[in-house]
Amino acid sequence: MKIKGIDSLFEIHRHLFQDVYVWAGKKRTVEISKDGKQFFPTSHFDNAFRYIDQIITEFTKIPRDNKNLFAEKLAEILDNVNYLHPFREGNGRAQREFLRLLALEKGLTLNINPPDNKSVYERYMKGTIESDLKTLTELIFELIDRVSNVYAENNRFIPRK
């Protein structure tokens, strides 16, 4: 799957949760919060979607060899998508897959949720909860690696029809 914009996040969510939630892949229509933190208001989703599409467009123009800028822009995308929290549930899993696919398009791997590394997940949670771009950028910078084109072509997310 090629990430074209925020709509791709909705496709990913639908694919991941279609057997769990009837509303999988659909934007939430209710206001939500977690631990007292209010997420983005649904009344302004359209503006936020356009903004995230703009950030993704900027990301696509970054040269593959600019790892610093690559990590910074992915952190910015992650921070904004997390604050947006467009789904009632499953936001974290969908956004991690979304970022993984963005990285893969640049020929890089990114696994923000490795099963054997609890500290990565804890730093991810701290960065997203506190909207800490420095922590998110450093984490992404540490986790991205180059992959061969063969791997990138054969390890794509393929949504069900």
For the regions a language model picked out, list residue spans one by one.
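FIC/Doc superfamily catalytic core
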Residues: 1-161
